[in-house]
Structure formats: C-alpha cells, structure tokens
Amino acid sequence: MDAALKQEVKDWIADDPDPATALALTELVNRGDEATLRKYFSGFLQFGTAGLRGPIGPGPSCMNRAVVGRTAAGIAAYMKKRGMNSVVIGRDARYGSEDFTFETAEIMSGAGMKVFILPRPLPTPVLAFATSALKCDIGIMVTASHNPPEDNGYKVYIGPVADGINYAASQIINPTDGFIASDIAAVRSLKSQPRGSEWTILGEEEVDEYIKRSSALAPRPSDIKIVYTAMHGVGTETLKKVFTQAGFNNLITVDEQCTPDPDFPTVAFPNPEEPGAIDLALAKAREVDADLVIANDPDADRCAAAINDPVVGWRMLRGDELGIIFGEWIARTHPKGTFGNSIVSSSALRKICAHYGINFQEVLTGFKWLAKIEDLAFGYEEAIGYSVDSKTVNDKDGISAAIFLAQIASDLAKSGLTLTDLLNEVWGRHGFHGTEQISIRVADMSSIARLLNGLRKSPPSEIAGRAVKSIDDLAAPQDGLPPTDGLRIWLDGDIRIIVRPSGTEAKMKCYIEVITATSAESQKLLDEIRGPLKEFLS
C-alpha cells in the first residue's frame, strides 16, 4: 500500500470520533484494500451552496461524524468572525441523521453557540421556519432530500444579513459557501475542537405555529378527496395536521409510504418525479375515485401532484404545469409583489405576469436564488419546488404547496372546473408550453465539463435536425444573472434547450421547452427532438 495514503488513513482514524467508521477503516488498512481506501480518501466531501451531500461511509469523501464534525467546526468559525451566536438544527429520518445532528450540536455548543434542536425528525420547511421564528443566525438541516437511501447531507440557512446578502432565513449562495468551505478546510483536527452539551430541545411551539400558518393558506374547508404519499419520508405527520386544521378531512394516505423508512423500500429512488415512484398513489387514487394525488419528497420541501386527465386518465403534472397553476391562480387572486422562476423553468410564468401586470424576475437554478427576491409573492423551479408563502418559509415548501393546491382544486370544483381546465385557459392565452427534462448519468463530472467546453469552442450549426440560432454561455451571462456553468441554446422554431451539470449528482441535465398550439403538437416535437438530442449530448 502507498505509504502516504496509509499515513493519511491512520491520521484520520486517530481523529475520528466514531468507533464504527474508525474500525471500518482499520480493517481496510489491515486487509491492504488500497482501492477502497482511495475511494474513501479522494478528497474532503465538497461543501457548496447545497451544503454537503454524499454517501454514508468512512473517510473524508463520505458523510460521517468526522466529516460532519469538521463541517460544524468550520461553520462555527465562520459564525464567530461575523459575531453570530445562535443555531437551530433539524433532521430527517435517514440513516445517520440523528448522530449527525448531535455531533453538530456538541461542536456548536463547544464553540459557545446557543444551540436549538427540533424535537424529532421533521420536514425541512419546519427548520427553515424555525430559523426565522427563533431569529437564529444559522439553520442546519441534516437531510439528503430525495437522494438514494445510502446518502445523507447537510443544508445550511442564514437568518440575518451576511456577506452583504439579505438572507432572511434562506439557503446560502456565493460567496458565503466559499467562506464556509475555507473555514472547514482550516480545521486540522476534530479532536482538538472543544465539545459541549448545552442545548435546548425545542417543544412544539415552532411546529404548531408553522402548522397554523400553513393551514391558513386554505381558509375554505372542503371534502375534496385527496390521496397522499410521503415517499417514506417525514412529511406525513405535519401535513396531516395542516390539512386537518384547514378542514380538509378527506385525506387518504398511501400507508406503505407514509411512515418514515430510511430504506425507501417501495421505490427505486425516493423522488416523486422518478418513473414509478407514485404508482402506489395512483393505484390508490383509482381505487377510491380520488380527486387529486399529492406527493412530497422525503424531506417534504418539494410537492408533486397527479390529476385524472380527461384524455389520458391519471397522470403526473410536470413541475412546470404545477408552477403555472399556482402562478395563474395567485396572479388572479393576489396580483401583488414579485413572481419568479429559474432559467430552466417554463417561460409561461413570465407571460402570465405580463398579462396581469405583475413584476417578474428570472434567477439561476436553485431555490436559494428565488429566496433572495425581495417581496416574493410566488416562486417556483421546475424540479417541483414551490414557494406560495415566503413570509412563513423563505424556501421551497412542499407542505404549504400541498394545502394551497388542495384549496385551488376545491375552489375550481365548486365552479364545475378542474385543474386541467385552468391549464387549458392559460395555454389558450399564451400557447401550449411543452417542457421536458433529460438526465444523463456520467461516471464523473469532468466529462460534462469537457462537453460544455467543446460546445463553447466549436458551436454546432444544428441539433436534432434544427438550425442553431444562438447559444448563450451562462458562464458569461448578458442578462444580469450571476455566472453559472451551462449553456442556453436556441433552435429554429423558438425551441429552447438548456444544458448544465447537476448540483447534487453525477449527471448532466438538459431542459427543453417548445411552444405550440396544442399539447399533441408539443409532444410530437419533443418526441422528435429527444432521441437525437440525447445522442448528441452522450
């Protein structure tokens, strides 16, 4: 075994606070398993605007107590430099989440911080709300959201103004992530960090207030029949309380998926967007003749929905379709403030805002950018993230979105209308906006960089048989957006394609938008483009 690697591993073992991961590494050293050790020691798990996200395992390249402890120490150092002194910590029900929560609490307490801990595994929006309600400087959520079961992660929120940014209890953006990453890198030894045991386990006050505010989004009780799945996550308890308090008592749960289970046994990936993920919910909807299906992802910050389409039967609404439903409804009923969506989301929201005379702002991908819009009345990203009440949660919130959608569906039903009718009205006014996302998994992120750089140096003249009109390099934007890695490609026929690397997984994401007169024309065009585009990008 390489001597330098062996010494690095031994040094890490000596500093590891978790006997289980220390033993796992010791056994690998004793077996001389250099290949596995190199995988676990391929660099410290990268901290960015999404915080931490990675597989649970030993060593600096995985999620474990040693990595989490060093990260907490780095965040504490960042806080001290800015006179911050309070933190609230939440967690989901994934493997390791409770251990990582209390590892963080010990380090923060040892650093002299005032530490609050949510009383049990709860949705991410509750943590975001608690950060604001408690006026904490920092909020930390231990979760990997909708990642595979072997992963865990760490989201960071900032309460006040910091680094010249009015965070208002939202997730970090540049340059804050870089400052924190530098402070994490400066932590040479975890064992040298003082530990404490002074913290407050919160009661139900913050949870109850969140439930009260969310239920107020649906002031008109209804007996609309809704099937709900939590995707084996932590959403069920909180969502049911919100619906009950709002007077929506005809909620039918998918029992196989509504108890927290870190193995996510009924789905290949615990993401409502993944094919097959809500099959059990759709089956239940057919069985009980439901009016609507609602799904949260495991940490309940995202919301998906399915409707009984009069043409094709039960189907998932695309993220953009749900965004357009929310946008049109809020524009009709409360045409105030600023609306926004991300650059990869449908352009239809901009047109809705123009129609109703509402301010609109486009931002980079990631809800952390939408949360920085002043006076945000509604914001969404196509990856089923929605903000319908930014005064309560300045982040995407799958539970408030769920109850608000239920109210919209109920109000429409009282007029003999459906969500499909609402969408058709928008499409009749602005044209049918067909959108689709293609994801291409890669062995490593460097292959995406090579592809994007190749397109920049040698732009194609045509893609999928259609002439390329122009290419916008998002790394050098012309429209006032901050730079980001990706390309926006315009083809003949006002076809928009955006290509960018995923922020959390080893895959490339491609977003297509076509505008046609009808759904059928849109689907035909997407079908023609999809295959050649995947081949071009692979």
Which residues fall in each region the model found?
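Short beta-alpha connecting loops at secondary-structure transitions
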Residues: Y154-I172, S197-W199, P262-F269, A305-R315, ...
